[in-house]
């Protein structure tokens, strides 16, 4: 508990605590009991919003609702308030003559932020607002702190992230964004389940980081006296399940990478990985396009997705281009030609492309060219395929040109949204690539991984040809909610 709770109470907090004590003295539990509602605000509006004042009087419908008091006005013998539940707000009208004296005292002394239950008649005011004319009030919970910014929501960005509960109470746009996030994840599940995929769970604690190029968080298991890492990907465990015969699997879960934070990166994030036996990267391109298009249709409809003023043709076939061709389009440099590492380094110097100390292969320079010149041009959904072997340690080599792999990444609005490939199922080749990664790690590449011998052993039992995919859920949520920072789609982002 923070020291904030032990600081001197302000006047409002003192008054609210006095009201809490007064409720208890009247035999009313300040923090309430179970309460059964007959409807929420959205259901009432759907049922009665289009009815006239006279129609509602004739119908004589009653309802029982509950929620948080967000506004309150009126003095003397009558008053109005807006009650907020998960679906929105609805107005209540309370008149002293229509409720018990105790009930009216509850209403009079209620503060903004308190929870109440209301039973009454559904009606419309003279200005046409759907409301509940209260016949009975039930106190449900006392708010001991006042809500921020009564009418304008919570505007302080830092507080919105640190105290997400206040953001959700006061900013409906933020609340709805997280409802949409939940729907996005549900629709991805629905799509994959419909294709016969099994959702599975794999360990978060790993003995060896693997499945991605990233720096892990390291922890220690006291009972076993061993260092472990939080997973940087779910890939290697999911492929063990393909070895085990599950054929079509996916996992939606948290991934942890001990790296920098910016508008699109958080150390803890959500990804989905999908693996399909007897498939290749082209099948997985089709699957990826299907997942994205199905989810977009469910969330935003059949039209284009608008992101920061740019229309994304999400329902059109996605463009497909080889990485080497994309580089050639932007720079004129042709990496289809065979060349030495020194020749590639000279091209990099000529085009001001950075070459890292641990770069020892042409493929790494090709990838740097792509990042430097191509990524920023990819606005509409584009599959870039054919990544070099040097930057794709888990992908199968291309049959026609073994310098490259059967791998692709999906780019939208210059950002990577998915990474996929025909999986490497040759244990001898895989071991050689793991060993090359381990060497890069020794040379200072802190994103390179070591050798996972247990995974090699699993491959030695035989894995069928397989296609695999990873999609960043948070970035997809940003795209489909037109949000510019990952913190606005994470309920509790990492804070300093």
Curated annotation (Swiss-Prot):
<feature type="binding site">
    <location>
        <position position="416"/>
    </location>
    <ligand>
        <name>Mg(2+) 1</name>
    </ligand>
</feature>
<feature type="binding site">
    <location>
        <position position="416"/>
    </location>
    <ligand>
        <name>Mg(2+) 2</name>
    </ligand>
</feature>
<keyword id="KW-0030">Aminoacyl-tRNA synthetase</keyword>
<dbReference type="InterPro" id="IPR002313">
    <property type="entry name" value="Lys-tRNA-ligase_II"/>
</dbReference>
<dbReference type="InterPro" id="IPR004364">
    <property type="entry name" value="Aa-tRNA-synt_II"/>
</dbReference>
<dbReference type="GO" id="GO:0004824">
    <property type="term" value="F:lysine-tRNA ligase activity"/>
</dbReference>
<feature type="binding site">
    <location>
        <position position="409"/>
    </location>
    <ligand>
        <name>Mg(2+) 1</name>
    </ligand>
</feature>
<dbReference type="GO" id="GO:0005829">
    <property type="term" value="C:cytosol"/>
</dbReference>
<comment type="similarity">
    <text>Belongs to the class-II aminoacyl-tRNA synthetase family.</text>
</comment>
<dbReference type="GO" id="GO:0006430">
    <property type="term" value="P:lysyl-tRNA aminoacylation"/>
</dbReference>
<dbReference type="InterPro" id="IPR034762">
    <property type="entry name" value="Lys-tRNA-ligase_II_bac/euk"/>
</dbReference>
<dbReference type="GO" id="GO:0005524">
    <property type="term" value="F:ATP binding"/>
</dbReference>
<dbReference type="GO" id="GO:0140096">
    <property type="term" value="F:catalytic activity, acting on a protein"/>
</dbReference>
<keyword id="KW-0648">Protein biosynthesis</keyword>
<keyword id="KW-0547">Nucleotide-binding</keyword>
<dbReference type="InterPro" id="IPR004365">
    <property type="entry name" value="NA-bd_OB_tRNA"/>
</dbReference>
<keyword id="KW-0067">ATP-binding</keyword>
<dbReference type="Pfam" id="PF01336">
    <property type="entry name" value="tRNA_anti-codon"/>
</dbReference>
<dbReference type="GO" id="GO:0016740">
    <property type="term" value="F:transferase activity"/>
</dbReference>
<dbReference type="Pfam" id="PF00152">
    <property type="entry name" value="tRNA-synt_2"/>
</dbReference>
<dbReference type="InterPro" id="IPR045864">
    <property type="entry name" value="aa-tRNA-synth_II/BPL/LPL"/>
</dbReference>
<keyword id="KW-0479">Metal-binding</keyword>
<keyword id="KW-0436">Ligase</keyword>
<dbReference type="InterPro" id="IPR018149">
    <property type="entry name" value="Lys-tRNA-synth_II_C"/>
</dbReference>
<dbReference type="InterPro" id="IPR006195">
    <property type="entry name" value="aa-tRNA-synth_II"/>
</dbReference>
<dbReference type="GO" id="GO:0000287">
    <property type="term" value="F:magnesium ion binding"/>
</dbReference>
<keyword id="KW-0963">Cytoplasm</keyword>
<dbReference type="InterPro" id="IPR012340">
    <property type="entry name" value="NA-bd_OB-fold"/>
</dbReference>
<comment type="subunit">
    <text>Homodimer.</text>
</comment>
<protein>
    <recommendedName>
        <fullName>Lysine--tRNA ligase</fullName>
        <ecNumber>6.1.1.6</ecNumber>
    </recommendedName>
</protein>
<keyword id="KW-0460">Magnesium</keyword>
<dbReference type="GO" id="GO:0000049">
    <property type="term" value="F:tRNA binding"/>
</dbReference>
<dbReference type="InterPro" id="IPR044136">
    <property type="entry name" value="Lys-tRNA-ligase_II_N"/>
</dbReference>
């Amino acid at each position: 508990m923070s020291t904030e709770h032990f600081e001197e109470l302000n006047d409002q907090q003192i008054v609210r605590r006095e009201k809490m004590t007064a409720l208890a003295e009247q035999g009313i539990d300040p923090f309430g009991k179970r309460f059964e509602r007959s409807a929420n605000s959205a259901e009432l509006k759907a049922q009665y919003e289009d009815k006239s004042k006279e129609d509602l009087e004739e119908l004589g419908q009653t309802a029982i609702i509950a929620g948080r008091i967000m506004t309150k006005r009126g003095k003397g013998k009558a008053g109005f308030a807006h009650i907020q539940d998960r679906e929105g707000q609805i107005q209540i009208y309370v008149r002293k003559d229509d409720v018990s004296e105790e009930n009216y005292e509850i209403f009079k002394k209620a503060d903004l932020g308190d929870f109440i239950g209301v039973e009454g008649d559904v009606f419309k005011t003279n200005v046409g607002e759907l409301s509940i004319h209260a016949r009975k009030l039930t106190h449900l919970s006392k708010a001991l702190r006042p809500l921020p910014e009564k009418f304008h929501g919570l505007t302080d960005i830092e507080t919105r992230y640190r105290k997400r509960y206040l953001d959700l109470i006061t900013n409906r746009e933020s609340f709805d964004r997280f409802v949409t996030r939940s729907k996005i994840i549900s629709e991805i599940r629905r799509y994959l389940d419909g294709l016969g995929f099994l959702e599975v769970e794999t360990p978060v604690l790993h003995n060896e980081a693997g499945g991605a190029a990233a720096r892990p968080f390291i922890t220690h298991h006291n009972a076993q006296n061993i260092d472990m890492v939080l997973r940087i990907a779910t890939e290697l465990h999911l492929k063990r399940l393909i070895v085990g015969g599950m054929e079509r699997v996916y996992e939606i879960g948290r991934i942890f990478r001990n790296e920098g934070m910016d508008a699109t990166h958080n150390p803890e994030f959500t990804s989905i990985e999908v693996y399909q036996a007897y498939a290749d990267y082209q099948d997985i391109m089709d699957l990826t396009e299907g997942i994205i298009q199905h989810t977009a249709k469910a969330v935003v409809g059949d039209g284009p997705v608008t992101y920061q003023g740019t229309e994304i043709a999400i329902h059109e076939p996605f463009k497909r281009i080889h990485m080497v061709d994309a580089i050639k389009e932007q720079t004129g440099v042709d990496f289809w030609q065979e060349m030495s590492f020194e020749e590639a380094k000279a091209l990099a110097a000529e085009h001001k492309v950075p070459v890292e100390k641990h770069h020892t292969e042409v493929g790494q320079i090709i990838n740097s060219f792509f990042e430097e010149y191509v990524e920023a041009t990819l606005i509409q959904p584009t599959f870039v395929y054919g990544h070099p072997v040097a930057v794709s340690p888990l992908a199968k080599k291309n049959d026609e040109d073994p310098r490259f792999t059967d791998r692709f990444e999906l780019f939208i609005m210059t950002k990577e949204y998915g990474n996929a490939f025909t999986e490497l199922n040759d244990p001898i080749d895989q071991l050689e690539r793991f060993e090359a990664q381990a060497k890069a790690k020794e040379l200072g590449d802190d994103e390179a991984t070591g050798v996972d011998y247990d995974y090699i052993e699993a491959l030695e039992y035989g894995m069928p040809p397989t296609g695999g995919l990873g999609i960043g859920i948070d970035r997809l949520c940003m795209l489909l909610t037109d949000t510019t920072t990952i913190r606005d789609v994470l309920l509790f982002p990492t804070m300093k």
